[in-house]
Amino acid sequence: MAGIGRKIASYVGIVDDRRYDEEDLPDEELTTEVYSDDGYEPSSEVTQLHHHDSNEQHARGHKAVQHRRRSELEEPSIADINRILTVHPRNYNEARTIGEQFREGIPVIMNLTEMDDADAKRLVDFAAGLIFGLRGTIERVTSKVFLLCPRNVNVTPEDKARIASGGFFNQS
């Protein structure tokens, strides 16, 4: 039983466990382990993977697939101002709604004037991560009002001016 008590005391740091202090042992008690040869021999043989170029694939009846970046495939479109979602979150729990709508390609206006500063900062940080991850843009319309645009949507300067001059959003 004393062995268990000593191990616990050593683990907690109450007593020193001198079994592992090499400086306390004489040199003849220090040993080095020698591993036996287990028959392993390094090989210089390289196994080559099958490589097909596009001409070989056509000859075999397979279509050559050209991979394009997603940004090359999606054409930017002008956003309809009626399709912009305006959100007035009162707490951070409403971030999910913002993220889901933005992910669907809908521009989102976040009006954070009704939130306390700590939650507003968290929501702006969330929006910045959302914008970065989905390659969109974020613009500050007024104090505590932000416009989040997906990457395949362009909001015209006229629409931005209308958003900023709308009596509700003009916080300055």
Swiss-Prot record:
Its main location: cytoplasm. Pfam families: SepF (PF04472). GO terms for biological process: division septum assembly; FtsZ-dependent cytokinesis. Residues 48-59 have a biased composition (Basic and acidic residues). Coiled coil: none annotated. Signal peptide: none annotated. PANTHER family: CELL DIVISION PROTEIN SEPF. Belongs to the SepF family. Cell division protein that is part of the divisome complex and is recruited early to the Z-ring. Probably stimulates Z-ring formation, perhaps through the cross-linking of FtsZ protofilaments. Its function overlaps with FtsA. This is Cell division protein SepF. The gene is sepF.
